[in-house]
Each structure stands twice: as structure tokens, then as C-alpha cells.
Curated annotation (Swiss-Prot):
Location(s) in or outside the cell: Virion; Host nucleus
Stretch list, region Disordered: 1-21
One GO location term (cellular component): host cell
Short sequence motif Unconventional nuclear localization signal: positions: 1-18
Family the entry assigns: Belongs to the influenza viruses nucleoprotein family.
One Pfam family cited in the UniProt record for this chain: Flu_NP
GO BP of this protein: symbiont entry into host cell; viral penetration into host nucleus
Entry-linked InterPro entries: Flu_NP
Motif Bipartite nuclear localization signal boundaries: 198-216
Any one GO MF annotation of this record: RNA binding
Protein role: Encapsidates the negative strand viral RNA, protecting it from nucleases. The encapsidated genomic RNA is termed the ribonucleoprotein (RNP) and serves as template for transcription and replication. The RNP needs to be localized in the host nucleus to start an infectious cycle, but is too large to diffuse through the nuclear pore complex. NP comprises at least 2 nuclear localization signals that are responsible for the active RNP import into the nucleus through cellular importin alpha/beta pathway.
Chief site of localization: virion
Gene name as annotated: NP
Protein name, entry field: Nucleoprotein
């Protein structure tokens, strides 16, 4: 990134920090993790959960969701003003699973949001600790990215299902702040912008008046976030054009879809963070580990080390494969939904297989599912090596943007070759001359055509032994060139929307 100096690191975004040095950043991220852990311990006490029940990922998700809902100001206000039958706007809750007489039972719990907020603040030294809330949102988002393929959402906005590798963070709430914006993929931003433009086309008052002014500010801010993800001058110039449009309409939508397609080769920079479920942080804090004192990073060895020693359990449906459930959660914990499967497999030390071959549904259990036949098992979340998370998009040459990996948004900074069939991608660009100034388009298409698939991304970068905390001895893996390991292709993952 050319403007690297002006960018805040993820950890600064994560902790709303001003400029901090590495030690301060590690401490403030650690403080955030401490808070989540303390909150989780307190909630397990409130709910009278056994140690095993407290380590159940489904219980963790319910507890995380309760606190996120308790702090969702906008929705809380909406619920107060639009009361719906049988829903108390002041309460939040969800399913909690307990082991009774050798069987799993579902118990629906309900708490005052005020009470949950009190427990959360108490665990966070009286602060609202927004960073911790965002952290949990990103964990939920990473889990969704791994579980569901967003083809329907893509098709609805006129994009191509092959662009699913651009959809990281597509289920993050709007209120997820700078840390949330950093992990959103190019496709996610394009989708949000298209939705806004479409509303403007259908509603003539959308851009007018006081509300319209706020909308306009939001629109321009989203354009700037997306612009910041692109790494070539031509893509950025096109974003300026979209942002400055007096009356955004179909021409802008065309431009955005064109830009999204171009991002399949000229990859955007999208951050990756390892956000773990609260039931990992809780037991670690309970066992006496002081995250703030020791320091913690979301993009280094720390999450790997934490997962090496964590016991996490999951409910398993009768026909699900526990190993496959483990893979799903492992990928979510490492933010690896769009990583090359060859790279993930090497790091994990066991073969990581495509979504369509996994015999497992999502982690959450629907309220109408039968608990009688429900089992549980340990999730295997350990790894053989660790690697540094990247945000570069894997373009081999930052100055003149070259081939990033198609259908992949790299998570780990690990050398790999770029096996891809550029012709398929380029075919998407022929005969599409709508939209305006074609000089920028011509420039972008020229860059894409000159991208060479035989180049190597992240040259010389490797994985590290778990004993190598200082990342001193990189092990550069060699991969089988022939097939690129895309998680979602040739595949029938469930839809997030259904």
C-alpha cells in the first residue's frame, strides 16, 4: 500500500487507539480479550453452566449474541418505538444447552438487556468496551463466511457467483466500526454501495433534505473505504468517479460491478484477524492467563498458541462428521474462508477439504431441531504450523499490480504460485462497454491481461514451527501447481439468507 504510513494498524482500529507502539498495541488488544474472557466467566456463573457446558461453542454463540443485542442501540430504539407482539424490547436471550441425565437439553433463557450491559461493563472496568463487541462481531462474521456461500446475495445485485471470494465480512453489522471495515472484502463494499444506489433510484427523496445529506456522507465514506482497498491508480480513480457522481445511478452500478470483477485479478487489500469464540478466552482467563500483561495480537502466533491448548466442544447432529465440524470452526477461527486450501492444509497439518464435501451443517442449532438424538464432540482446532495473517491480497507486484489469486483472498502471508485460468475471468470483461470513461477501464483491463499466472505470491514467505515465536526460521512450502484450492467452487454450500 502506497499510503501505508497514514494507515492505522488493525490493532489500533481494534482498540480505537491513537498511535501506539507495538507493545502498547499488544497490551490494549490483550485488555480487550481479558474483558471478553471475564464477561464469559461471569455469564457461565449466572447461567450455572458446568465447565463442559461453558466450553460448548453453541452456548458461547448465544452468550455473545446476547451482549451484542444488548448494546445494539439502533435496534433497541427501533424495537421500543415499534413494539411487536410477544417480544420484549428490554430483554434478550437465546438457547442454552445443558447436559441432563446423559442427554442434551435446550433451555431458553431471557435476561434484561440492562443486566447484560452491567455484567459486560463490570468485566471491562466500567467501559462500554466497543472493541470487544466488534471483535465478537468479526468472529460471527468469519463463521458465517466459512459456513455459507453468498451466491444469492451476489446474483440479486447483478454480480457473478464466481465473485464469492470477494465477500468477506458480508454479514457484519453496519455498526462494526473501523475494525469491521478493515475486514470487509471488495465485493461486500460493492454490494453495500449498490444497495444504497438502488434505493436512490427507487425513492426520489432518498438523497434530499437533512436525511439525504447524512445518506450522502455515508455513501462517500463507503466509497472511500472501498477506494482504500484498491491498490492500483486506475481502480482508485474509478472509485473517485463513483464517489463524486452528483446523482448515483445505473452507470455507477455498472462501474462498481466492473471494479468488483477486476478485483478477482487485481486483488484489494482486506485484513484478516483471528477472532476466537468467547468460550476460548473465558477458560484461559479463568486459568490465570493475563492477556493484557502478556500482550496479544490477532495477526501473529498468539491465536494459534491459544487454540493449541483450548478445549472447545460442539453439539453434533446424528449424520454430521465431527472432523468436518472441526474444520469449519478451525477455518472460522483463522479467518481462512477464502484462503487457498493448499495453504490451509499445510498450516493445519491435515487436509482441508472444500465446503461441498463437508458433511456438516452450520454450528448453530435451530429451535425446532430434535435434541434427543444430539451428541457432542471435541473440536480439533490445533495446527501444525503458524503463519502471519496478511492484508495484501497477494498481488505479486504492488507498484503495477499483478496477478493476485483468482477465487482466493489470501489469509496467510505464505509463498504460493498462482494457478488460475485467466481466460475465464477475462471473458467476463468482453463486450461490456456501458459505464463511462473507458480509458480507466482500458487501463484496468490492460493490467489484468498482463498479469502473469506463473508468478509467485508472497515470495520467500513461509510458515513457522509453533516453537518459533519470533518467526525466525520460515519454512517455505512447495505446492502442487495443478489445482488451486478454492473452498467454495464445485460446491453446494448452504445460503446465508435462507
Amino acid at each position: 500500500m502506497a499510503s501505508q504510513g497514514t494507515k492505522r494498524s488493525y490493532e489500533q482500529m481494534e482498540t480505537d487507539g491513537e498511535r501506539q507502539n507495538a507493545t502498547e498495541i499488544r497490551a490494549s488488544v490483550g485488555k480487550m480479550i481479558d474483558g471478553i474472557g471475564r464477561f464469559y466467566i461471569q455469564m457461565c456463573t449466572e447461567l450455572k453452566l458446568s465447565d463442559y457446558e461453558g466450553r460448548l461453542i453453541q452456548n458461547s454463540l448465544t452468550i455473545e449474541r446476547m451482549v451484542l443485542s444488548a448494546f445494539d442501540e439502533r435496534r433497541n430504539k427501533y424495537l421500543e418505538e415499534h413494539p411487536s407482539a410477544g417480544k420484549d424490547p428490554k430483554k434478550t436471550g437465546g438457547p442454552i444447552y445443558k447436559r441432563v441425565d446423559g442427554k442434551w437439553m435446550r433451555e431458553l433463557v431471557l435476561y434484561d438487556k440492562e443486566e447484560i450491559r452491567r455484567i459486560w461493563r463490570q468485566a471491562n472496568n466500567g467501559d462500554d468496551a466497543t472493541a470487544g463487541l466488534t471483535h465478537m462481531m468479526i468472529w460471527h462474521s468469519n463463521l458465517n463466511d466459512t459456513t455459507y456461500q453468498r451466491t444469492r446475495a451476489l446474483v440479486r445485485t447483478g454480480m457473478d457467483p464466481r465473485m464469492c471470494s470477494l465477500m468477506q465480512g458480508s454479514t457484519l453489522p453496519r455498526r462494526s466500526g473501523a475494525a469491521g471495515a478493515a475486514v470487509k472484502g471488495v465485493g461486500t463494499m460493492v454490494l453495500e454501495l449498490i444497495r444504497i444506489i438502488k434505493r436512490g433510484i427507487n425513492d426520489r427523496n432518498f438523497w434530499r433534505g437533512e436525511n439525504g445529506r447524512k445518506t450522502r456522507i455515508a455513501y462517500e465514506r463507503m466509497c472511500n473505504i472501498l477506494k482504500g482497498k484498491f491498490q492500483t491508480a486506475a481502480q482508485r480513480a474509478m472509485m473517485d468517479q463513483v464517489r463524486e457522481s452528483r446523482n448515483p445511478g445505473n452507470a455507477e452500478i455498472e462501474d462498481l460491478i466492473f471494479l468488483a470483477r477486476s478485483a478477482l485479478i487485481l486483488r484489494g487489500s482486506v485484513a484478516h484477524k483471528s477472532c476466537l469464540p468467547a468460550c476460548v478466552y473465558g477458560p484461559a482467563v479463568a486459568s490465570g492467563y493475563a492477556f493484557e500483561k502478556e500482550g496479544y495480537s490477532l495477526v501473529g502466533i498468539d491465536p494459534f498458541k491459544l487454540l493449541q491448548t483450548s478445549q472447545v466442544y460442539s453439539l453434533i447432529r446424528p449424520n454430521e462428521n465431527p472432523a468436518h465440524k472441526s474444520q469449519l470452526v478451525w477455518m472460522a477461527c483463522n479467518s481462512a474462508a477464502f484462503e487457498d486450501l493448499r495453504v490451509s492444509s499445510f498450516i493445519r497439518g491435515t487436509k482441508v477439504i472444500p465446503r461441498g464435501k463437508l458433511s456438516t451443517r452450520g454450528v448453530q442449532i435451530a429451535s425446532n431441531e430434535n435434541m434427543d438424538t444430539m451428541g457432542s464432540s471435541t473440536l480439533e482446532l490445533r495446527s501444525r504450523y503458524w503463519a502471519i495473517r496478511t492484508r495484501s491480497g497477494g498481488n505479486t507486484n504492488q507498484q503495477r499490480a499483478s496477478a493476485g489469486q483468482i477465487s482466493i483472498q489470501p489469509t496467510f502471508s505464505v509463498q504460493r504460485n498462482l494457478p488460475f485460468d485467466k481466460t475465464t475471468i477475462m471473458a467476463a470483461f468482453t463486450g461490456n462497454a456501458e459505464g463511462r470513461t473507458s480509458d480507466m477501464r482500458a487501463e484496468i483491463i490492460r493490467m489484468m491481461e498482463s498479469a502473469r499466472p506463473e508468478e509467485v505470491s508472497f515470495q520467500g514467505r513461509g510458515v513457522f514451527e509453533l516453537s518459533d515465536e519470533r518467526a525466525a526460521n520460515p519454512i517455505v512450502p512447495s505446492f502442487d501447481m495443478s489445482n488451486e484450492g478454492s473452498y467454495f467452487f464445485g460446491d453446494n454450500a448452504e445460503e446465508y439468507d435462507n
